Structure formats: structure tokens, C-alpha cells
UniProtKB/Swiss-Prot annotation:
UniProt cross-references to NCBIfam families, sorted A to Z: rpsL_bact
Keywords, alphabetical: Methylation, Ribonucleoprotein, Ribosomal protein, RNA-binding, rRNA-binding, tRNA-binding
Region ranges (Disordered): 1-57
Gene3D superfamilies documented for this protein: Nucleic acid-binding proteins
Protein's gene: rpsL
InterPro entries: NA-bd_OB-fold, Ribosomal_uS12, Ribosomal_uS12_bac
Function field: With S4 and S5 plays an important role in translational accuracy.
Listed name of the protein: Small ribosomal subunit protein uS12
3-methylthioaspartic acid PTM positions: D102
SUPFAM superfamilies recorded: Nucleic acid-binding proteins
Family: Belongs to the universal ribosomal protein uS12 family.
Any one Pfam family match given in the protein's UniProt record, by short name: Ribosom_S12_S23
Length: 137
């Protein structure tokens, strides 16, 4: 516990909160070739690698992921939600924030049904989260 004198000399500092999706807080000025402070809810990018990885203990699966070069020139790892996907290298994807708890280093999700990413086929429930169209009656 500091004394009053110590607090007078060096006051308490407010805690700085760190962003959970830092790539979303950076823009890029291609004319000046400089990064800018421009936060956005989604970012467009190009898939540079598509693959699977195994989750942390105690889970076991092959989770689909894509390495994406964003429009702000940052490269991030993003999760591909849903069953089956049509992504390959050079696919243009839309990213949103949101981590995957059992995949270390994966802080972003790919938006299904946007740009080159197809929605999940034969999806009846939670369709809006997976970009699936309403089935014909």
C-alpha cells in the first residue's frame, strides 16, 4: 500500500485495455503507403493458406482455418465456421472479430455467405450465422 506522499509524487495510472482483435483497428492508406487508425467491424482479405489444425486439450477434432492477408496488409489466422466450405488459396473473404477458444492464435471468424465464401448447404437453423438461404417450402 503506497503512502500519500508516494501517491502525490507518482499518481495511479488508469489501466490500458488491449484490443481482442487488433487487426480490425488498423486501416491502410495505399496512396501514402502508411497504416492508419481506422477501426472497422469487418475487413476484407485474401486467403493465402487454407488448412486444418487440432484444438487444445481436452478437445479433439480437425478445425478448418485460413491464413488471410487483409486489406490493411496484416496477415491473420481466421476460423471457417460450419460444415464444409469452398475456400481455397486466393479466395476473397470477409472477416469479423471473435476468437475460437480451443485454437490458440485464432482471433477472427470468416463470414459465411459473403464475397467468395459460400453459405453452409442444407442448413435449417441459425441460418443467418452461416449465410444459408431460406429453403423452399
Amino acid at each position: 500500500m503506497p503512502t500519500i506522499n508516494q501517491l502525490v509524487r507518482k499518481p495511479r495510472r488508469a489501466q490500458v485495455t488491449k484490443s481482442k482483435s487488433p487487426a480490425m483497428n488498423v486501416g491502410y492508406n495505399s496512396r501514402k503507403k502508411v497504416q492508419t487508425k481506422l477501426a472497422s467491424p469487418q475487413k476484407r482479405g485474401v486467403a493465402t493458406r487454407v488448412g486444418t489444425m487440432t484444438p487444445k486439450k481436452p478437445n479433439s477434432a480437425l478445425r478448418k482455418f485460413a491464413r488471410v492477408r487483409l486489406s490493411n496488409l496484416m496477415e491473420v489466422t481466421a476460423y471457417i465456421p460450419g460444415i464444409g466450405h469452398n475456400l481455397q488459396e486466393h479466395s476473397v473473404v470477409l472477416l469479423r472479430g471473435g476468437r475460437v477458444k480451443d485454437l490458440p492464435g485464432v482471433r477472427y471468424h470468416i463470414v459465411r455467405g459473403a464475397l467468395d465464401t459460400a453459405g453452409v448447404a442444407d442448413r435449417k437453423q441459425s441460418r443467418s450465422k452461416y449465410g444459408a438461404k431460406k429453403p423452399k417450402a
